[in-house]
């Protein structure tokens, strides 16, 4: 069974017995509106809209190659029969994507030709065919479409996929490169709310960053050098030292072009 067939079948079972255009299903103490599957393909097409925004960061965020006080994003929404799915495009600078490239791609997308959001493979294949790249914009549409379908069914995706929410991977809190005082402050703010912390490294104060954090917490750490270590020898020296200090994962140790090392 293909993914869209599974989703549509699951949706039909989920709303069987519903009365009128929208029914509700109790989930805990709340009622979640659900879509009448009999209306699929009979109404207007999907409506795509988007809005760029800029988040103001509480602390200046520094990595090995740049610093910033804000971070841009583009919110994507897909509307269908009174339901709305949301997605977000995140644009890492090193991937060459920006608010401008994301919005330029989204302006090409016409989802009004589709009046059944459960045709996910067809819809996403169309979106992918519009350009060879633009991963951030495509991901935002993908997320919004999944969010919409989950809301139409009144069922979260972790449940549709048969996952255990209690066993979901931990989310990290990222601590940017900064002075010891600010690093201590950031660590105190998050240490009791996360099971693992992610630390930006890749400059000449890597050990100072880790030692400062260790003054506050003994939580497991992941580090991201953002391609800041120059060669294999430097990277290995750093990695061995980091392992001795409770670091369990290293991300982007060297330049992305340096594949052989």
Task: Set out the residue ranges of the language-model regions.
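Metal- or metallocofactor-binding catalytic centers and their adjacent structured scaffolds
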Residues: 39-50, 66, 78-79, 84-152
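C-terminal segment of N-terminal export signals and the immediately downstream linker at the start
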Residues: 22-59
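N-terminal export signals
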Residues: 5-27
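A short, compositionally biased
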Residues: 69-74
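Short, P/G- and charge-enriched loop/turn segments at secondary-structure junctions
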Residues: 60-65
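Metal-dependent enolase-superfamily TIM-barrel catalytic cores that perform enediolate-based chemistry
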Residues: 157-261
């Amino acid at each position: 069974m293909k993914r869209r067939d599974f989703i549509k079948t699951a949706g039909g079972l989920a709303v069987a017995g519903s009365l009128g255009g929208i029914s509700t299903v109790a989930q805990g103490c709340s009622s979640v509106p659900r879509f009448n599957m009999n209306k699929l393909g009979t109404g207007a097409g999907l409506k795509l809209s988007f809005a760029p925004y800029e988040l103001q960061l509480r602390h200046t965020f520094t990595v090995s190659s740049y610093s910033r006080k804000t971070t841009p994003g583009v919110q994507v929404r897909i509307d269908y029969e009174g339901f709305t799915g949301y997605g977000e495009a995140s644009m890492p600078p090193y991937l060459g994507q920006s608010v401008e490239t994301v919005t330029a791609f989204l302006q090409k997308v016409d989802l009004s030709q589709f009046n059944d959001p459960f045709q996910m493979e067809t819809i996403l294949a169309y979106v992918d065919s519009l350009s060879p790249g633009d991963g951030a914009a495509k991901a935002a549409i993908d997320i919004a479409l999944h969010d919409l379908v989950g809301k139409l069914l009144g069922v979260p995706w972790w449940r549709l996929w048969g996952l255990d929410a209690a066993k979901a991977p931990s989310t990290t809190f990222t601590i940017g490169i900064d002075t010891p005082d600010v690093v201590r402050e950031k660590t105190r703010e998050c240490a009791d709310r996360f099971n693992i912390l992610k630390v930006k490294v890749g400059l000449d104060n890597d050990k100072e960053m880790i030692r400062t954090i260790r003054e506050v917490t003994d939580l497991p750490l992941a580090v991201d050098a953002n391609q800041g270590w120059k060669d294999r020898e430097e990277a290995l020296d750093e990695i061995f030292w980091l392992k001795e200090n409770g670091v369990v994962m290293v991300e982007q140790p060297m330049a992305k072009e340096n594949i052989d090392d």
